[in-house]
Amino acid sequence: MAKDKKKTEVSEVSINIQQIQPISKSKKDDLEIVEKKKKLKSIKTETFSSTQAGQREYIIIPNEQNFEPGIKGLKQKQKLQKQLTSKYSKDILNKEHIITTQNYKPDLNKHIIELKNVKKSYITGDLETPVLKGIDIKLDKSDFIVILGPSGSGKTTFLNIISGLDKASEGDVFVLGSNLSLLKDSHMTKFRRKTVGFVFQQYNLLTNLTAKENAEVGENLSSKKNGMSIDEIFETIGMKDQMNKYPHQMSGGQQQRVSIARALAKNPDILFADEPTGALDEEMGRKVLEILVKVNKEYKTTVIVVTHNPNIAKIANTVIHIKNGIIDNLEHNAHPADPQTIEWA
């Protein structure tokens, strides 16, 4: 009878492990992990697994019979449960990144970004939350691309992964020929400095520097010297006469334009913008979008914008609709709208 019970416990634990099989090397390894947990302090354990709102929780629950009665026993149980659960999560979830391809080289003459079966989950304590659930897509050079989706859809996570701000949990992320999933942190930092520019909803200007000096920060971080000059950039953003202003002397729209200038000073191959008009009024928002369109058309810079506003998506020639962590639709627009003609509300 005891043997049957033991087999049942191992079987239940094995089933729970199989739920995250993609990051496990083999069933043998998984069962070894289970046996280690069962031998820990010679105390039997049970595994509890629950699924709620797309989240998976893995908890080790020690059996009641191994502890003293009353509050003292409860504290012993809670302490051991915490130790076991944490160790279990590390053993199971901290596996090597799984890549989909071997020795694959994307067509750089056409596709600047290519994703293959990209997944992303976040681990908080012992809670795993899947955000991206298998993304496959190819994006062309020199396109104006909008990533569109509601709050919580995974659009910002998607942007962070293709820009090198975050790493995928699984799959391949090819950007400019490099598989970002395989880059070490130091190489990822170098990649961001050399090849991409960022514009965020928060301007993050240095308050003790002028507009020009803030833009030059971006220029100094880059090794490229063949891009636009600072004067040309401020001409592009329509602020050539305001280069010596400090952030406190500028409106929100002007500060956002300076943040664009800072990104352009790196002469990036790709310009990423996360909700760049989110904190601006309609007039300033349209001006910022006009600048992004101008950069895309005149300098052939690939521009990728994240937004929740479907009207802004009309200015793009490629629109990626993301919903619940997957690409719901991929739209190509042969005649993008002018930022001044789109509805704003």
Q: Which residues are covered by each model-predicted region?
A:
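Conserved beta-strand-loop-alpha-helix hinge in the C-terminal portion
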Residues: 326-345
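ABC family nucleotide-binding domain
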Residues: 108, 112-322
